[in-house]
Amino acid sequence: MIQDSEFFRMEGVPITKEEIRAVSIGKLNLDPEDIVLDIGCGSGGMSVEIAKRSKFVYSIDNSEDAKNTTSINLKKFKIENCEVFLGDAKDLISKFDFNKVFIGGTQNIEQILEILKEKKVEKVVANTIVLENGVKIISKFEELGYNVDFVNVSVSYGKKISSGHIMLSKNPITIITATLK
């Protein structure tokens, strides 16, 4: 995994943290022939890591800053098998052929999941920090007939203080994996 500090960052554009990227990549179970859609690509952390392990990545974000940040990171890490698009994922999904999806943003999530089911996407991994979004995503996947697995991951980082060391935790992330039956 590439360390978070190596990525170009822009104020207000989120990045999936290194340890969460590692678990999410593991859940995607990527193959060199996979074509992956990254919805809500943010700073492009997942796009870069996925592209290193798959045939091609389509990255989408509705923020121009996110699109630009992802593009900068793709160039920085010499990733050529990824294309970034600006817009609403629900309107763009039908333009692409892919077999796996990573979702880092939850805008219009229920409509997006319905479209993914219509396209018979074999595996979807969705990350969320908001509990209600996690429940909504899990319920929708179950309604659509997917096998669903989910895990909540908490990461703490060590920090030296004058009297020793402490662990500082980040927000826990729910990682939802849905596999087509």
UniProtKB/Swiss-Prot annotation:
Residue numbers binding S-adenosyl-L-methionine: 16, 40-44, 61, 89
GO MF terms held by the record: cobalt-precorrin-6B C5-methyltransferase activity; protein methyltransferase activity
Coiled-coil stretches: none
Organism domain of life: Archaea
EC primary class: transferase
Reactions the enzyme catalyzes: Co-precorrin-6B + S-adenosyl-L-methionine = Co-precorrin-7 + S-adenosyl-L-homocysteine + CO2
Enzyme Commission number, as recorded: 2.1.1.196
Keyword Hydrolase: no
Protein name listed in UniProt: Probable cobalt-precorrin-6B C(15)-methyltransferase (decarboxylating)
The organism of origin for this protein: Methanococcus maripaludis (strain C6 / ATCC BAA-1332)
Source organism phylogeny: Archaea, Methanobacteriati, Methanobacteriota, Methanomada group, Methanococci
Gene name per UniProt: cbiT
